[in-house]
């Protein structure tokens, strides 16, 4: 059923996630494991014998190495951005990232080894690109004269969404259908947009509250319920 460029997403409690991964490793192969996402659900239940559970696990496997994946980003917090320096040449605030690798032996690239500003390294960009960035005031130099690359916030997509999701709250009252394990629509929206595109077909073999169907309609996907 799963297409070659498809993904399978399995939502489980932490206590059985290792069983699911073991089964999926056998079916798809360990190399097809993509992520085990931690979704913070809250939870106030007291437990005298162990720590209380406050998250669910979302396990993602692909059928092949051609699976669909569309990175998503969260907007930068304005207050956080304002803590970074302003570049007077571009009138934009920026962070910075390394311009050279600290472990060239891991991935030797002789064509990227050259001397810049008196420092010989294996750089992450070619000498021509380094010169271009320097001339455009897109390099910042530390006290030793080693360059780092300016990353202007206005030119970035935002903060990449990673495998810890603590920004989606549990089901809202207006969404409730009195189904015990109903998932919030925001959660399904994120999953669908990460792993599929418009017109794709999504399968929910359990259906449950039908939230996946609502999300598919909202995001222009087709869906099948069993």
Give the location of each predicted region.
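Core catalytic lobe of class I
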Residues: 1-226
């Amino acid at each position: 059923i799963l297409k070659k460029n498809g993904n399978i997403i399995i939502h489980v409690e932490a206590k059985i996630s290792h069983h699911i991964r073991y089964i999926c490793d056998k079916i798809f192969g360990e190399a097809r494991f993509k992520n085990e996402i931690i979704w913070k659900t809250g939870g106030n239940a007291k437990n005298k014998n162990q720590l209380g559970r406050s998250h669910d696990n979302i396990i993602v496997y692909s059928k092949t190495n051609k699976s669909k994946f569309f990175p998503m980003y969260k907007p930068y917090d304005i207050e956080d951005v304002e803590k970074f320096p302003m570049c007077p040449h571009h009138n934009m605030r920026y962070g910075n990232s390394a311009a050279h690798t600290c472990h060239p032996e891991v991935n030797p690239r002789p064509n990227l080894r050259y001397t810049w500003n008196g420092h010989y390294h294996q750089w992450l960009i070619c000498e021509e690109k380094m010169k271009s960035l320097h001339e455009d005031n897109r390099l910042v130099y530390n006290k030793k004269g080693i360059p780092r690359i300016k990353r202007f916030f206005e030119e970035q997509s935002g903060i990449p969404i990673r495998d810890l999701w603590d920004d989606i709250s549990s089901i809202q009252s207006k969404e409730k259908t009195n189904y015990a394990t109903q998932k919030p629509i925001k959660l399904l929206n994120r999953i669908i947009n990460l792993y599929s595109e418009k017109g794709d077909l999504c399968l929910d073999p359990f259906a449950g509250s039908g939230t996946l169907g609502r999300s598919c309609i909202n995001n222009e996907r087709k869906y099948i319920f069993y």
